[in-house]
A protein has these predicted regions:
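Extended alpha-helical surfaces
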Residues: 1-279
Length: 279
């Protein structure tokens, strides 16, 4: 296992309440990423793939769309892979993640059913791919985040008396419980140790405060999970996750945040679907 004494020692201390940053997710990719071992680069790539996911969705809808430069692939690379897969060709897993190839192939070959959300299908494939990672922390992080997001969706759907099952992303045991259980705690009271905390957070009336509490829960979870990882790639992965959280809050003031989340809830009521932004 590689140790990154100088890299980690030089990282700034972060808190969720930070209102300014001297470092960004993009800076990490250009300045620190090149110093990582090849195996550790693959782990960090899992973080940046979330931007590739969004970019693929954009390009499938509009081949000339501007993409987020924080992804692992350029617009030219993505366009080439999309073209190959559209034509029925294969793209090697060594150059392009298998789950993205699967998703793009399905996009062109399978008819979309009513109410089908491509974002949900891609999210399910992404989480399954990341959770197969051999790094225990990284795999656990994606599992934790999938469970947290799905429980939130289930609680929201139950509140508005919607059918929960089609809104759950993934195929884990927790996913199955959320789809099928009518129990107050979905039968997960002993399996998900933060369930009651999550229920209380979901009942917070102030929407921005609720989202901040959720991010604090995520923040606390990753800090506990990597407590003994001092100079490892896990610490760098956590740094990236925390950077992204802070960047998002800096760019989203409270008033705009309230408007955003109210529009999400309104869409939920009107369309009987959980918008991708809510995940």
């Amino acid at each position: 296992m590689s140790k990154y004494y100088y890299l980690v020692a030089g990282l700034p201390e972060l808190t969720l309440e930070d209102s300014k940053l001297s470092y960004t997710v993009a800076d990490f990719k250009t300045e620190l990423y090149p110093a990582l071992s090849e195996d550790d680069k693959k782990l960090i790539d899992l973080f940046y793939l979330k931007f590739d996911n969004a970019n693929v969705l954009k390009l499938l809808k509009d081949k000339d769309a501007a993409i987020d430069p924080r992804g692992n692939y350029s617009s030219e690379e993505l366009a080439e892979y999309i073209s190959q897969l559209k034509d029925g060709d294969e793209v090697s897993d060594s150059v392009f993640p298998s789950y993205l190839s699967t998703f793009i192939s399905e996009y062109f070959s399978l008819p979309a059913e009513d109410g089908f959300l491509y974002e949900d299908r891609l999210a399910a494939l992404y989480y399954a791919y990341a959770m197969e990672c051999r790094n225990q922390f990284v795999s656990s992080w994606f599992g934790f985040n999938l469970t947290l997001n799905n429980i939130l969706v289930a609680l929201t759907a139950r509140k508005f008396k919607l059918d929960i099952a089609p809104l759950i992303v993934g195929d884990t045991e927790v996913c199955e419980a959320l789809r099928t259980s009518n129990a107050r705690d979905f039968g997960l009271g002993t399996e998900v140790d933060y369930l009651e905390q999550l229920v209380k957070i979901s009942e917070t009336e102030e929407l921005v405060d609720r989202e901040k509490k959720l991010d604090q829960l995520r923040w606390d979870w990753m800090e506990v999970a990597t407590f003994f990882d001092y100079f490892t790639v896990e610490r760098l992965f956590v740094f990236l996750l925390q950077l992204e959280m802070i960047e998002r809050w800096i760019s989203l003031d409270k008033e705009k945040g309230n408007q955003l989340f109210r529009s999400i809830i309104a869409a939920l009521k009107d369309e009987v679907q959980i918008p991708a932004e809510f995940r």
